[in-house]
From Swiss-Prot:
Record text on subunit structure and interactions: Associates with VAM7.
Pfam family of the protein (one): SNARE
GO biological process: amphisome-lysosome fusion; autophagosome maturation; intracellular protein transport; piecemeal microautophagy of the nucleus; vacuolar calcium ion homeostasis; vacuole fusion, non-autophagic; vesicle docking; vesicle fusion
Organism: Saccharomyces cerevisiae (strain ATCC 204508 / S288c)
Gene: VAM3
Disordered, as annotated region: 1-26, 116-146, 162-182
Membrane topology reported for the UniProt record: Single-pass type IV membrane protein
Entry's localization field: Vacuole membrane
Parts of the chain on the Vacuolar side: 283
Transmembrane domains' residue ranges: 262-282
Keywords: Autophagy, Coiled coil, Membrane, Transmembrane, Transmembrane helix, Vacuole
Record domain t-SNARE coiled-coil homology: where: 190-252
Any one GO MF annotation of this record: SNAP receptor activity
Family per similarity comment: Belongs to the syntaxin family.
UniProt-recorded name of the protein: Syntaxin VAM3
Amino acid sequence: MSFFDIEAQSSKGNSQQEPQFSTNQKTKELSNLIETFAEQSRVLEKECTKIGSKRDSKELRYKIETELIPNCTSVRDKIESNILIHQNGKLSADFKNLKTKYQSLQQSYNQRKSLFPLKTPISPGTSKERKDIHPRTEAVRQDPESSYISIKVNEQSPLLHNEGQHQLQLQEEQEQQQQGLSQEELDFQTIIHQERSQQIGRIHTAVQEVNAIFHQLGSLVKEQGEQVTTIDENISHLHDNMQNANKQLTRADQHQRDRNKCGKVTLIIIIVVCMVVLLAVLS
């Protein structure tokens, strides 16, 4: 092989490795994008849970609508425009699940935003209204020569306005307290609802685990029952085999005894014949 052939093979191998390296690099970049999308979705989910709670505010909703949701949408569009997402089954399945979760987060945010609108705080009355509430009095001198000054009370502002102002302030304080209590009760009910949902989820998971354990126990009991049945059948077969063996041994013993009897009779006959022949010869 010449030097040029070796160079041609090495260049061919390098040309085959370059596309593979490029594909692996693109796949890694796509995986990083999916991880970024998952992380931003988790941040969005965490911030959406604050809607309707004490930490809810205009700044929070502005951040969700102008920063978190657009960032997630931008990363999602980048992933969808990547060709490799349709060629890699695992990454495609992960992205599909994240995309479905992101859509549900958007719907949840819109629902919570409409369910918990932000309330504007009650502002105190203007200075003009407060001036109207206070009784207006003016000092007049009835007699220029007299040193006494009489107070003239305006008919449109009786002295009872002080009590009315106090009642109005009490009413405003009560309304503010009621609104604060209603918001606290709403937050408390929301927290209780979330905790109950989590408890129900945990109970459901525990029930599923218990069902799985009972299913496994049922399978084990069934297997043990089959094994016990097999052992019982084997014991029955062994008992039958032992009985058959005892019968065969009894028959063999009886047959051996019969053969021994026949041998003894034959031996006696032979002895008698020999004695008769011997006596005949001697006589």
